[in-house]
Amino acid sequence: MHTKDQIFAAPIARLGDFCFDEQVVDVFPDMIQRSVPGYSNIISAIGMMAARYAQPQSRLYDLGCSLGAATQAMRRHVTQPGCHITAVDLSHPMIERARAHLSGFKSEVPVELVEADICDIAIENASVVVLNFTLQFVEPEKRAALIQRIFDGLRPGGILILSEKFRFEDAPVNELLIDLHLDFKRANGYSELEISQKRTALENVMRTDSLPVHQARLRDAGFAHQDLWFQCFNFGSMIAIKSSEPAQP
């Protein structure tokens, strides 16, 4: 049984920026399930896609791994020989809790847990890279360089799975999907106070992009094949495939 998220249930006089500290880590499984529509579906599909695209003797990266849900999904599904997962998170409590979670499962796929900024991680010999609701917390001016480094570090035929909360350029549609997401959170037991305080805490640390912005960034990095494969309200996930054919001059 997961600990219930009640971080914002009482009024907070001096509300700081949201951070992935011990308090958040303690309730993270409950928080993510009650806040992100389709999260379980995305995690399951990450495992399925890793099974299809993992290449023998390659690395799989989970960048912003939190408690290791995507890492564990990949471990369960990957059967190619010689694969190795590198799971990275900047939060010390997240990495320590992920280590405890992952140690409870036996797998032939080794995992290296790294406490670091994902913008400082070298991507090498990769067949699968996962950014699961992580890029939105990276400073906007650093995002293109990160995507480029991922592309450069992928083997031909490798994939990037990019899950994000999206902003929509059509104002009425954007407003509708925001409202539907708020209804989703209300239906999952969050009060108006919790919703309001969490939104305020997140506004300076989570900055969302539109789908066309993501698509242009992926295209500019060199991904010839990319599209949205999942969406629920204003949350979704994209897949980008590095062509196995040499780029045309």
Curated annotation (Swiss-Prot):
<protein>
    <recommendedName>
        <fullName>Carboxy-S-adenosyl-L-methionine synthase</fullName>
        <ecNumber>2.1.3.-</ecNumber>
    </recommendedName>
</protein>
<feature type="binding site">
    <location>
        <position position="199"/>
    </location>
    <ligand>
        <name>S-adenosyl-L-methionine</name>
    </ligand>
</feature>
<feature type="binding site">
    <location>
        <position position="132"/>
    </location>
    <ligand>
        <name>S-adenosyl-L-methionine</name>
    </ligand>
</feature>
<dbReference type="GO" id="GO:0002098">
    <property type="term" value="P:tRNA wobble uridine modification"/>
</dbReference>
<comment type="subunit">
    <text>Homodimer.</text>
</comment>
<dbReference type="GO" id="GO:1904047">
    <property type="term" value="F:S-adenosyl-L-methionine binding"/>
</dbReference>
<dbReference type="InterPro" id="IPR029063">
    <property type="entry name" value="SAM-dependent_MTases_sf"/>
</dbReference>
<feature type="binding site">
    <location>
        <position position="39"/>
    </location>
    <ligand>
        <name>S-adenosyl-L-methionine</name>
    </ligand>
</feature>
<dbReference type="InterPro" id="IPR005271">
    <property type="entry name" value="CmoA"/>
</dbReference>
<comment type="similarity">
    <text>Belongs to the class I-like SAM-binding methyltransferase superfamily. Cx-SAM synthase family.</text>
</comment>
<dbReference type="Pfam" id="PF13649">
    <property type="entry name" value="Methyltransf_25"/>
</dbReference>
<keyword id="KW-0949">S-adenosyl-L-methionine</keyword>
<feature type="binding site">
    <location>
        <begin position="117"/>
        <end position="118"/>
    </location>
    <ligand>
        <name>S-adenosyl-L-methionine</name>
    </ligand>
</feature>
<feature type="binding site">
    <location>
        <begin position="64"/>
        <end position="66"/>
    </location>
    <ligand>
        <name>S-adenosyl-L-methionine</name>
    </ligand>
</feature>
<dbReference type="GO" id="GO:0016743">
    <property type="term" value="F:carboxyl- or carbamoyltransferase activity"/>
</dbReference>
<keyword id="KW-0808">Transferase</keyword>
<dbReference type="InterPro" id="IPR041698">
    <property type="entry name" value="Methyltransf_25"/>
</dbReference>
<comment type="function">
    <text>Catalyzes the conversion of S-adenosyl-L-methionine (SAM) to carboxy-S-adenosyl-L-methionine (Cx-SAM).</text>
</comment>
